[in-house]
């Protein structure tokens, strides 16, 4: 093999390696194969077999959803911040499209999951708020850089500002969570 061929092979290998690294990100790295012990191509029966004792219903967009009680660790948080319930949303292709871990509704749980998500995935890059209210009653922080894989941490509060709901969602269909998003930047603006 001559030097030109060897050089071309090395250049091609480095290009492929760098292209793969450029498309990888913390959300994709963690959830590319699936979430909560199931692959993204899991169907209804596989979900129900892994998490028995749940119930099927429809979400607000008429998509099939399966919710089952499940106490397990989330993002290696301490035991007091375990999941309470997992809800699996079925996509248009009949497979798992997203999983929402419902947490105990408390400010410590919300802060723990937000802070750990920022540590693991970096700063969130999109947000959704209840803009109709004077004081926002719901907020969602999203990590969307690794589309189609998306992580969302959401909460809803009562009139006094106490959390009523704390959720951690991971999806492989970014379009499910794209509605009403406002992109945010954590970079300081030039004066």
What are these regions (language model features)?
Residues 3, 23-28, 93-97:
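Short, compositionally biased strand/turn segments
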Residues 1-11:
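Bacterial N-terminal signal peptides that target proteins for export
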């Amino acid at each position: 093999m001559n030097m030109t061929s060897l050089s071309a092979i090395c250049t091609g290998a480095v290009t492929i390696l760098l292209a793969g690294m450029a498309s990888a990100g913390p959300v994709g790295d963690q959830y590319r194969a699936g979430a909560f012990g199931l692959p993204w191509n899991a169907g209804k029966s596989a979900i129900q077999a892994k998490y028995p004792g749940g119930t099927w219903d429809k979400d607000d967009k008429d998509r099939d959803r399966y919710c089952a009680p499940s106490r397990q660790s989330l993002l290696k948080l301490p035991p007091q911040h375990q999941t309470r319930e997992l809800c699996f949303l079925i996509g248009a292709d009949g497979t798992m499209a997203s999983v929402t871990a419902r947490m105990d509704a408390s400010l410590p749980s919300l802060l723990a999951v937000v802070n750990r998500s920022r540590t693991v995935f970096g700063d969130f890059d999109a947000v959704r708020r209840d803009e109709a209210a004077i004081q926002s009653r719901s907020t969602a922080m999203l990590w969307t850089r690794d589309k189609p894989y998306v992580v969302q941490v959401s909460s809803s509060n009562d009139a006094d500002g106490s959390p009523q709901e704390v959720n951690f969602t991971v999806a492989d269909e970014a379009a499910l969570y794209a509605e009403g998003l406002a992109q945010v930047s954590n970079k300081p603006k030039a004066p």
